[in-house]
Design a protein with these regions (language model features):
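N-terminal acidic leader/helix
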Residues: 1-27
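Charged, low-complexity, helix/coiled-coil-prone segments
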Residues: 1-8, 41, 45-51
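Charged/polar, solvent-exposed surface patches and flexible loops
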Residues: 11, 15-18, 29, 39-42, ...
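Amphipathic, hydrophobic secondary-structure cores in small proteins
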Residues: 23-47
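Long, compositionally biased
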Residues: 45-71
Length: 71
């Protein structure tokens, strides 16, 4: 995986954690378990052009669709 994609995923994890009142570790585990990390890696070309809030919203939807319970 390219460094720029890794950096973007890290930023998104941090933003997700802040928006959902989670630690970074909790956010990573949740996103990993519910395919959010996979989504970001596969859709980097589109997602990185959007705002971070849009990315967090997309992650919330993807994770809910894969069994996640965080609103």
């Amino acid at each position: 995986m390219e460094r720029k994609i890794i950096n973007y995923i890290v930023v998104c994890i941090n933003e997700f954690a802040l928006s959902k009142n989670l630690t970074e570790q909790e956010a990573f585990r949740y996103l990993y378990a519910n395919k959010g990390i996979e989504f970001l890696a596969e859709n980097y070309d589109i997602e990185h052009t959007l705002s971070l809030q849009d990315a967090v919203n997309d992650l919330s939807i993807v994770c809910r669709n894969n069994g996640g319970m965080i609103q």
